[in-house]
Design a protein with these regions (language model features):
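Acidic, Ser/Pro/Thr-rich low-complexity regulatory regions
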Residues: 1-111
Length: 111
């Protein structure tokens, strides 16, 4: 398995940026709504990022659990929720925008 390591100056900004990218891809139907469950909301991932999430960011990521069901039950509410979450993430990013530097490393395990 290849591992991407992110070493951000501001973890909150980086997590919000990743969440915004996921929601934008979900909204455009590039990836399915269930992707939220299997990415940031996956329990092992969520436990790792939780200490770096503001309460507002935590609430947004917790909503990732509901997107798939909401997309099937109420498309209008689904669209409103996606738009609201994207707006909330844009607000978080604007507040955190002065500390956006990060360093990436990628390591591949031996097969």
């Amino acid at each position: 398995m290849t591992t991407l390591h992110i070493h951000p100056q501001n973890p909150t900004f980086c997590i919000a940026l990743l969440a915004l990218g996921l929601l934008t891809a979900i909204k455009s139907n590039s990836i399915p709504p269930e992707a939220g469950i299997w990415t940031l909301r996956l329990p092992k991932n969520y436990r790792q990022i939780l200490p770096y999430c503001t309460p507002e960011l935590q609430n947004i990521i917790e909503c990732f659990d509901e997107l798939d069901a909401l997309s099937q039950l109420d498309t209008a509410a689904y669209t409103q929720t996606i738009n609201r979450l994207i707006g909330d993430l844009q607000h978080i990013l604007a507040e955190q925008a002065e500390q956006y530097e990060l360093h990436l490393t990628i390591s591949a395990s031996d097969r």
